[in-house]
Amino acid sequence: MKDILNCSLLAHNTFGIDARCSRFLEYASVEEAQQVALLLRDEGLPYIIVGEGSNLLLTKDYDGIVAHSAILGCKEVSVDGANADEVYVSYGSGVTWDDVVAESVSNGWHGAENLSLIPGEVGASAIQNIGAYGAEAKDLIYKVEAVEIATGKVVEFGVDECAYSYRQSRFKHEWKNKYLITHVTYRFSRHYSPDLDYGNIRQALAAKGVEGMPSPELLRQTIIEIRQAKLPDPKVMGNAGSFFMNPIVGRDVYERLAAQYEAMPHYVVDADHIKIPAGWM
């Protein structure tokens, strides 16, 4: 376990701001997460839990404790009742998210291709319900393992318990700062059925001369290129990535807008709600 006083947070925020915290605690195992949890509980100082810090804007030094996961690695796990088309893989919460996508594509585990190049770590995927180009983490998450800060006990939550919705979860609300996430198990598919109808994916593929179904590798590379064309590399120019949320409106509101703006892009969320891209607005 790392325990550093007056620690720089330069490596833990994508804006590249060299603010400092009073104390930095980093855990690399479940046992270390339990130690960190009890320290957070007993020290009586304010604390925050960070990943890569893409949702963090530090305007001054933080007078408190910053906790971070360095739990790495992954392993396939068996799940009762799983069908032959499914593969379940548990990742440490400190693994870089895009490494998960790259590994899944390389191994023929499908479903994460559209989530390529999203900044952050595995733990954050379960908190934020990260998403892009018609895909969300909740569509892949099977369960989340964590340590309860109040007790140091190891707990786990099935995907339904986390109450995921658009960029939301219980970890952002009633469970905020109550758990240190240690592992997330994702359910991938061995069957490749890509979603190409969101945003300008098809146009970008057509520009490459691809009219049919792209390979998973080509789809991932195309998503990466689309994202890189919109946003600078945070390692070169500090930024928070795409942090906004696209508005979701009722069908009645959508129909009024569509009557005014016939070319307005939109995506059906459910029978009563439509998502309108904020970038178009």
Task: Name every feature range the model reports, one short phrase each.
Residues M1-L140, V144, E148-A150:
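Anion-binding (especially nucleotide phosphate/pyrophosphate-binding) glycine-rich loop
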